[in-house]
Amino acid sequence: MIAGIGIDVAEIDRIKRAVEKTPSFINKVLTKGEQAQLATLKNQRYYEYIAGRFSLKEAYSKALGTGIGRHVSFLDVEIIDNELGQPVVVSHPFDGPAHASVSHTGQLVFTEVILEKGE
């Protein structure tokens, strides 16, 4: 049974500017595991990854119904790409499965997260 659905859109250039202005932005948004994946990327893909994780975590918090803040932080959720490049939610505070999808087009990243609960 679906417990929550969250969607988000982020501008890649806006995230790039945030990283360039405040390099610690990465430490506030990405877990150590996500930072390890990020370290393997270059050029535009580097910023797409950061924007994608930022947006996925926003979508996750919307599916949870809380938004990012007091109940869930960016670092409470870890999303790692599997060998096929699919984002997998490997760590999160919700008691049930979480499914993530991300798509990039031009300067935008679109994300969706679905949370499931048992019947």
Curated annotation (Swiss-Prot):
Record function comment: Transfers the 4'-phosphopantetheine moiety from coenzyme A to a Ser of acyl-carrier-protein.
Keyword Transferase found: yes
Protein family (similarity comment): Belongs to the P-Pant transferase superfamily. AcpS family.
GO biological process, alphabetically ordered: fatty acid biosynthetic process; lysine biosynthetic process via aminoadipic acid
Family matches, as InterPro entries: 4-PPantetheinyl_Trfase_dom (IPR008278), 4-PPantetheinyl_Trfase_dom_sf (IPR037143), ACPS (IPR002582), P-Pant_transferase_sf (IPR050559), Ppantetheine-prot_Trfase_dom (IPR004568)
Cellular component GO terms held in the UniProt record: cytosol
Cystine connections: none
Compartments in which it is found: Cytoplasm
Cofactor(s), by name: Mg(2+)
SUPFAM superfamilies: 4'-phosphopantetheinyl transferase
UniProt protein name: Holo-[acyl-carrier-protein] synthase
